[in-house]
């Protein structure tokens, strides 16, 4: 099997062309390949497939390192766009793709930046999914070690966002797993820890569902900004600093799509026998 190793701000991926080669992965195979000592090593496996809808260009599948399939990965979407361009699978600048939960448009810019239309944030608890009687800007979540206020939103995958004073001292290692598996998120959740620098600048750490803390999480950056805007804490254009680098997030509020812009880096191509 041919593959490419790529990363978006340090969030690393193996990307596989499922258009020109036949590929099939069991959860066990994915876990073996994801092992950084005995396999290739990655946060997520991305598969490019032929479109399910003839009006679109591709179908986009995402698997976490634990073998579970998920519906969205923002950093992966940028790498997906870079991959299909580099491999000559398309020459379009605006690339339309479907995912498990909806469609996206990926725009390849001339400065190595990829702009992703992430669609509208989803706030209705049942659609996140999140257990709550109604939408609120803040929810109280109780864990074994701490009670927190969080915003909850779906960007095609579920996110909770907790505001902290300092992301360097935030208890991500202990609180992250407890939030990820919290009973009020029946499909588990990506837990974001957001430090607000000013209305146009935040710092963020994300404990990802099925992957643990990563260098960057694109959909997590989108979720954090969306929550911050809904809570009246942020403006419409926000720089998000993650440990792997920065993203620009734009959102004009309810009824509008959210946009993420950032880099996508090709590291190397390889071949492995499954």
Swiss-Prot record:
Gene3D superfamilies: Diaminopimelate Epimerase, Chain A, domain 1. The active site is at 73 (proton donor), 217 (proton acceptor). One of its GO terms (molecular function) is diaminopimelate epimerase activity. One of its GO terms (cellular component) is cytosol. It catalyses: (2S,6S)-2,6-diaminopimelate = meso-2,6-diaminopimelate. It is found in: Cytoplasm. It is an enzyme of class 5 (isomerase). The keyword Transferase does not apply. Substrate binds at residues 11, 44, 64, 74-75, 157, 190, 208-209, 218-219. Its EC number is 5.1.1.7. The record marks 268 as: Important for dimerization. The keyword Protein biosynthesis does not apply. It comes from the Bacteria. Pfam families: DAP_epimerase (PF01678). The record marks 159, 208 as: Could be important to modulate the pK values of the two catalytic cysteine residues. GO terms for biological process: lysine biosynthetic process via diaminopimelate. Catalyzes the stereoinversion of LL-2,6-diaminopimelate (L,L-DAP) to meso-diaminopimelate (meso-DAP), a precursor of L-lysine and an essential component of the bacterial peptidoglycan. Belongs to the diaminopimelate epimerase family. This is Diaminopimelate epimerase.
